[in-house]
Swiss-Prot record:
Protein name, entry field: Aldose reductase A
Top EC class for this record: oxidoreductase
Organism: Dictyostelium discoideum
One Pfam entry name: Aldo_ket_red
Positions of substrate binding: H112
Record's function text: Catalyzes the NADPH-dependent reduction of a wide variety of carbonyl-containing compounds to their corresponding alcohols with a broad range of catalytic efficiencies. Probably affects several metabolic pathways in addition to converting glucose to sorbitol. Affects group size.
SUPFAM superfamilies to which the protein is assigned, alphabetical: NAD(P)-linked oxidoreductase
Biological process, per Gene Ontology: cell motility; glucose homeostasis; negative regulation of aggregate size involved in sorocarp development; protein secretion; response to bacterium; response to oxidative stress
Binding-site positions, NADP(+): 10-19, 207-259
Catalytic activity: an alditol + NADP(+) = an aldose + NADPH + H(+)
InterPro entries: AKR, Aldo/ket_reductase_CS, NADP_OxRdtase_dom, NADP_OxRdtase_dom_sf
Cellular compartments per GO CC: cytosol; phagocytic vesicle
PANTHER family documented for this protein: ALDO/KETO REDUCTASE
Length: 297
């Protein structure tokens, strides 16, 4: 049985998910089908990935046409994009995501970034956008209403640091159940983990493979060889043993299945400590570089 973590909302999140970031529209549907067939029961989506319609087609095929997987057995996450932080835009943005995914509800809906862009249309804008001040409180209060309406089961945040989390906790009627951030041995974020553990906020690791940073790493390679596993297996298992959920991504069917092969081994404590000590604050997804917004400095 795949391990899961009970969120503060009372719902369980499976610790191994399938990520759809940077997945090409022509490949993502098949990849999601392969993931569900391989046993994944946690699929991570976002409006800004511009592939939710294709993911939705895979859901319809598996949940309805073939009826090989039950909707209620799959934990599905999506995210509110930066352009839709104003209170009048939050619910319509979710409704577009639900329509694209072919779903009645989401298991988890996240505020994708603690940054708001100026709203110009319902189209997703990623670059050249003007920042606009919208308080996270305004956005969060609308997120809470989505839970009240039964459209989402849990709500959370993404890319929030300790300061941002403290702010939301100070006024939240419904506390954030999760915070999705970049996490891997080169960026293990111990202070963030400590804070989230204390406040029962679950951490999901995106880019758990470090966006290729570990491909030729001999030390992690040696650990992988010891357990007769791949480097991605070791990186994901490291995260799971720290109670993070992970959302590795791949469009290669064999690799999709391989990345799920995590439940027949345990990393020994000495190796876990060795991986912990590799931390060098290497952030591969930094808005200071692509938006000029130093969120993490």
């Amino acid at each position: 049985m795949e391990p899961s973590f009970k969120l503060s909302s009372g719902h369980k999140i499976p610790l191994v998910g399938f990520g759809t970031w940077k997945a090409e529209t022509t490949l993502v549907g098949k990849a999601v089908e392969v993931a569900l067939d391989a046993g994944y029961r946690h699929i991570d989506c976002a409006a800004v990935y511009l592939n939710e319609k294709e993911v939705g087609e895979a859901f319809t095929k598996k949940f309805t046409t073939e009826a090989t997987v039950k909707r209620e057995d799959v934990f599905i996450t999506s995210k509110l994009w930066n352009t839709f932080h104003k209170k009048e835009h939050v619910r319509p943005a979710l409704e577009r995501t639900l329509s694209d995914l072919g779903l009645q509800y989401l298991d988890l809906y996240l505020v994708h970034w603690p940054v708001a862009f100026e709203y110009t249309s319902n189209d997703i804008q990623t670059s050249g956008s003007t920042q606009e001040f919208v308080s996270i409180r305004e956005t969060w209060e609308e997120m809470e209403k989505l839970v009240d309406a039964g459209l989402v089961k849990s709500i959370g945040l993404s890319n929030f640091n300790v300061q941002g989390l403290m702010e939301v906790l100070s006024y939240a009627r419904i506390k954030p159940a999760a915070n999705q951030v970049e996490l891997h041995p080169f960026l293990s974020q111990p202070e963030l983990k400590k804070f989230c553990d204390k406040h029962n906020i679950h951490l999901t690791a995106y880019s758990p493979l470090g966006n290729g940073a570990f491909v030729d790493n001999e030390e992690v390679g040696a650990i992988a060889k010891k357990y007769n596993k791949t480097i991605p297996n070791v990186l994901c298992k490291w995260a799971i043993q720290k109670n993070f959920s992970v959302i590795p991504k791949s469009s290669t069917p064999s690799r999709v299945a391989e990345n799920f092969d995590l439940f027949n081994f345990e990393i020994e404590e000495a190796d876990m400590l060795f991986l912990d000590k590799m931390d060098k604050n290497l952030r591969t997804c930094d808005p200071a570089k692509f938006w000029g917004v130093p969120l993490f400095n």
